[in-house]
Structure formats: structure tokens, C-alpha cells
Amino acid sequence: MSVKIAPSILSADFAELGAGVEAISTADYVHFDVMDGCFVPNISIGIPVLQSIRKRTALPIDVHLMIVQPERYVDQFCDAGADLVTCHVEADTPEKIHLALDKIHAKGKKAGVVLKPNTRAEAVLPFLDK
């Protein structure tokens, strides 16, 4: 198994975001954290920033949605340039998370589920077929 490197844009200097993206050009992915202030206490970057980053790099962009009801936004993130979109299993009902994953796949993108640190690993079991 090979190790993949995905530096997070969240650690970049936003005044120099283009240069920050270019500085990680040898990485395997660009990691893009999205926080809504509800699912997690912080608020971060969104779709317009993703669109700008997509213009600056050919690297695959891994979008980590830390938002409530992610199925409302997965189409927009896919259209904005995401190559891989991950949703938290805790962010909605299992049916809605399945819907989000189906929408991501319908856009031809890779999909995944992620867990908060205190969530039991078994919580991903209903999603393994995705």
C-alpha cells in the first residue's frame, strides 16, 4: 500500500491562496475542509473558494464536508471541482447520507463517509456498499 499525501487548504495563508496551492503541486490531493458552524463549531471556506482552487491545480480535490444535511450541497461541490466528497455519518439520517453518496456517484465523483473522533467505527457499516 502506498501513502497518499493530501495537504489541507485550511492551513494556507488565504491572502496567498494561489501560491499555497502551487506550493503543494507534488502532493497527491488537495484536502478542502468545509465547516458550517452547526455540525462543527467553526466556519470555513465554501464553493467560491473551491472554484478558484480548481482553476489553479490539476490535482484531485478531496472535499471533506463537516456540515449538516450534506445532501443539500453535494451537487454544488461536485460541479465546483471536487473529485472526492466525504460526508460525516453523523450529519443526517442514514437515508439522507445514502442519498448524498448516490448524488456524488451520479456526478461521476468518488464518495466516502467519515466519522467524528468519538463515533464508533461500526457506524460506517450501513454505507460499505457505496
Can you annotate each of these PLM segments?
Residues 17, 24, 32-33, 77:
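Conserved, mostly hydrophobic/aromatic
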Residues 23-26, 79, 128-130:
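Alpha-helix termination/capping residues and helix-transition junctions
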Residues 38-70, 74:
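A short alpha/beta connector and helix-capping loop motif
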Residues 1-7:
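Generic N-terminal amphipathic, Lys/Arg-enriched alpha-helix
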Residues 30-45, 91:
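Glycine-rich, proline-tolerant flexible connector loops at the mouths of alpha/beta enzymes
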